[in-house]
A protein has these predicted regions:
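N-terminal secretory signal peptides and thylakoid transit peptides that target proteins
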Residues: 2-19, 23-26
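N-terminal capping segment at the start of a domain
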Residues: 45-80, 372, 427-429
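Zn-dependent metallopeptidase/amidohydrolase metal-coordination segment
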Residues: 48, 66-69, 122-126, 396-446, ...
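A non-catalytic alpha/beta surface segment that caps or lines the substrate-entry region
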Residues: 68-114
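A short beta-alpha structural unit
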Residues: 78, 310-319, 331-337, 363-382, ...
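Catalytic-core environment of secreted peptidases
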Residues: 97, 109-141, 146
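Alpha-helical metal-binding/catalytic segments enriched in His/Glu/Asp
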Residues: 124, 134-172, 263-267, 276-299, ...
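Midchain, well-structured core segments that form catalytic/ion-binding scaffolds
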Residues: 171-172, 176-340
């Protein structure tokens, strides 16, 4: 272990213990400010950091050119030509950082930096594909931030015990084939050869697209990461929600990624003449379903916490201006970090639906469509994120990720943790998506320090 690294790890450990025991707030703040950096490469105010914020900004701005749209955001759909061009740029960045690059059978890109010991891999990264008319920060921050961490380590001649790998997961957004987190899902063993014949809107199969990537679809399952291969996975990401921005907190410690359940509901009444049917004799499916939608919102809002419930659309039949709707179809989606809470809320929603059935003389039946269990972040990794942020004097907030992430899949096979940086006004999946360069630099510096802390703390037995 080089001297700078040893001094940093010894000092951060002792200082954090002392800071947490300080009962007088000014003393605690002074204590935190005394934690030194690993090496002097850059200063922000009175704090010295290792990542080069201008270099990181430059790579993010360059990446935003691939698929740029007139609104100022990007459309960089997974497996598209713009995605392929962006991937080539990322591969060259990895190679210039001295990483050994490989692409697995699912199209995931890995850049490896050797460690000094034969230990499991510390993996970190994100994705670079976007939604239609998306923003410049979702996925990109964690991808470019991961490469910047490696470049900063090269600058400081830092060596690690564990091998380090930066990963760019393919097709996280799922615009093709209706399969989000596709690359990470294959890597985690959750998706296999059964998905190869799924077609997109152009009639092309996943196998067709993989061949365009230069991959052999028959070897798709070779992309699975073997059990025990990873010491942990870290993902730096924008929050995509409002909480950090509202509270002016620079770093989010992600407790886990919420689970979700989705139902398809059908309300059946009786289609009848709109002019001749008295109001008190109507069995209006659309009116009843509209009450159901409001009931979902009211029940979800009634509980404390960060649970959310959504009805994304409604279809009414027969859909004529002069006919009372006899059928109305709508979905219900519930998300929370606690599956039991989702189930409890759903029970209350169903009770409200039963009341509305009686009031409107209709019947409503709901069928479970999809269920994803929550993915909890590893406690040791959460602690390392807090320690790294404290060493920089950065406040943290514990919060869940309400959006699906690649980390949710990798949590099935390895300890996982996520670092959030604020999203201005909570906007994401939009050209107006924005995170400040300072917040992004803070997140990358925290990632840098977390990698070193985990490298020091893990696999000591």
């Amino acid at each position: 272990m080089n001297t700078d690294r040893r001094n940093f790890l010894q000092t951060i450990g002792g200082t954090l213990v002392a800071c947490r025991s300080a009962s007088f707030l000014p003393l605690a703040l002074l204590c935190l400010a005394s934690v030194p950096p690993l090496s002097r490469s850059q200063e922000t105010g009175s704090l010295k950091t290792h990542v080069n914020s201008q270099r990181l900004q430059g790579t993010l701005e360059k990446l935003s050119e691939f698929g740029r749209n007139p609104e100022g955001g990007v459309t960089r759909i997974g497996y598209s030509e713009t995605d392929m061009a962006a991937r080539e740029y990322v591969i060259e960045l990895m190679k210039s950082a001295g990483l050994e690059v490989r692409i697995d059978a699912a199209g995931n890109i890995f850049g490896r930096r050797a460690g000094s010991e034969k230990l499991p891999i510390l993996l970190f990264g994100s994705h670079i594909d976007s939604v239609m008319h998306g923003g410049n920060f979702d996925g990109d921050v964690g991808s470019m931030g991961g490469i910047e961490v490696i470049r900063a380590m090269n600058d400081g001649k830092v060596k690690t015990r564990h091998p380090l790998e930066v990963v760019i997961w393919t097709n996280e957004e799922g615009n093709h084939f209706g399969l989000g987190t596709l690359g990470s899902g294959v890597a985690a063993g959750l998706l296999g050869s059964e998905i190869l014949e799924r077609k997109d809107e152009q009639g092309l199969t996943l196998a067709d697209w993989l061949r365009r990537y230069g991959q052999d679809p028959s070897h798709l399952t070779d992309a699975r990461i073997p059990p025990g291969a990873l010491a942990g996975f870290l993902e730096l990401h924008i929050e995509q929600g409002p909480y950090l921005d509202e509270k002016k907190i620079p770093i989010g410690v992600v407790q886990g990624i919420v689970g979700l359940k989705r139902w398809k509901c059908l309300t059946t009444g009786f289609a009848n003449h709109a002019g001749t049917t008295p109001m008190n004799r109507r069995r209006d499916a659309l009116a009843a379903a509209s009450k159901d939608v409001l009931a979902v919102r009211e029940v979800v809002r009634a509980d404390t916490g960060r649970q959310v419930g959504t009805v994304g659309y409604m279809k009414a039949e027969p859909g004529a201006i002069n006919v009372i709707p006899g059928r109305a179809e709508f979905p219900v989606e519930l998300r929370d970090l606690d599956t039991a809470k989702i189930d409890h809320i759903w029970e209350r929603i169903q009770a409200r639906f039963k009341q509305i059935e009686k009031e409107e003389s209709v019947e409503t039946h709901c069928e479970l469509l999809e269920e994803n269990a929550p993915a909890r972040s590893d406690t040791a990794i959460q602690n390392a994120i807090r320690d790294a942020a404290e060493s920089l004097g950065l406040a943290t907030m514990d919060l869940p990720s309400a959006a699906v992430q690649d980390s949710q899949q990798i949590a099935k096979i390895a300890p996982m943790g996520m670092i959030f940086v604020p999203s201005r006004d909570g906007i994401s999946h939009s050209p107006k998506e924005f995170s400040s360069w300072q917040d992004i630099a803070n997140g990358a510096e925290v990632l840098y320090r977390v990698v070193l802390l985990l490298d020091d703390r893990l696999n000591r037995n």
